[in-house]
Amino acid sequence: GFKKGKVFLFQVRPVVLKKNYSTYKKEDFITALNKLKNKIIKLKKKNHNLIGKTTYFGVMPDWNPAEIIGIKPKALAISLYQELITDFIWAKNRESYGFNDMTSNHLMSIFLGTPFIDVRVDFNSWLPKNLNQSTKEKLINYYLNIFKNNNDYHDKIEFKILFTSFNAETNDRLKQINNNLISLNEKKKISKELKEITLN
């Protein structure tokens, strides 16, 4: 600021320089990649808290960190995003509407500085809580299979894969699922539960 011709500095910060990656050794990169591989292998394993035999990851599903905080966000942005949304709040909100309680699961994982959404966690969070376990398992396997085979759906999962509410297309979409995967009675129950959630 200026006052009577004098300059007053309110805050002084050091100049931020870009990281010099040439100081890293090849072994550092190999170690980092091996740690990442082990982390992903662990996350993809069957989890007693989650329905689904494995998982996949994406930067655009659900809360879409790629658009909201970027592909390589600063540590502060990641921390705030986790605290305000992806650690707990996201799941509490869905649970309050009548979906599965996923409050013990984090939605987002960080891989070498890039935020990824855990798709299995996301899909579990959209299961109506009053569906029986068998129907939930069938739905999750159906969702995961579609996601795996359609790379262009990563930013469209709420419209192309999941049943997140009841609308004019819900019953038609359910009819398109093979009855050997999900029975007619199960489809009726899914439709009923989605309708109750949507009307509440």
Specify the residue positions occupied by each region the protein language model found.
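Conserved divalent-metal-coordinating catalytic cores
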Residues: 1-200
